[in-house]
Amino acid sequence: MPNQNLIALGFDFGMKRIGVAVGQTVTHSANAIAILKAQDGVLDWEKIKMLIETWHANVLVVGIPYNMDGSEQTLTFAARKFARKLQTRFGLPLSMVDERLTTIEAKRQWYEQGLTKRPQHLDNYAAKLILEQWLQEQKNE
């Protein structure tokens, strides 16, 4: 997908919350934009549709959680299922990114910015990191 101005929505999948970020390939930057509530991984698809339309997204990126040794876990399968549903429902190109350590990195960056209040939810910041990783991969192609 190189040499195109792509606008991507990135997702940090969780069973209770799904973080969302938006980014684009012109500046290779991303911003955290939303945390969507989910019930056992099920969410309001209309909210995602609204985000896709609002941001004019033309590609979707989903973080896939693996264990540190690269093995898969229950959440790995659930995130892949979510990714397949996204692609089927909206018909947009989809990329999956290894998201190991994104939540830890999101916390580190939160405190590095001098924000002392303990963050309750970092899902959208984790989505931003997932999307930044994907954007970097696009830049290197």
Curated annotation (Swiss-Prot):
Matches recorded under SMART domains: YqgFc
Lineage: superkingdom: Bacteria
Entry keyword set: Cytoplasm, Hydrolase, Nuclease, Ribosome biogenesis
One cellular component (GO) term of this entry: cytosol
GO molecular function, one term: nuclease activity
EC number: 3.1.-.-
Subcellular location: Cytoplasm
Pfam families from the UniProt entry: RuvX
Single biological process term from Gene Ontology: rRNA 5'-end processing
InterPro entries linked to this entry: RNaseH-like_sf, YqgF, YqgF/RNaseH-like_dom, YqgF/RNaseH-like_dom_sf
Family: Belongs to the YqgF nuclease family.
HAMAP family (UniProt xref): Nuclease_YqgF
Summary of the function given for this chain in its UniProt record: Could be a nuclease involved in processing of the 5'-end of pre-16S rRNA.
NCBIfam families assigned to the protein according to its UniProt record, in alphabetical order: RNAse_H_YqgF
Protein name stated in the entry: Putative pre-16S rRNA nuclease
Classification lineage: Bacteria, Pseudomonadati, Pseudomonadota, Gammaproteobacteria, Legionellales
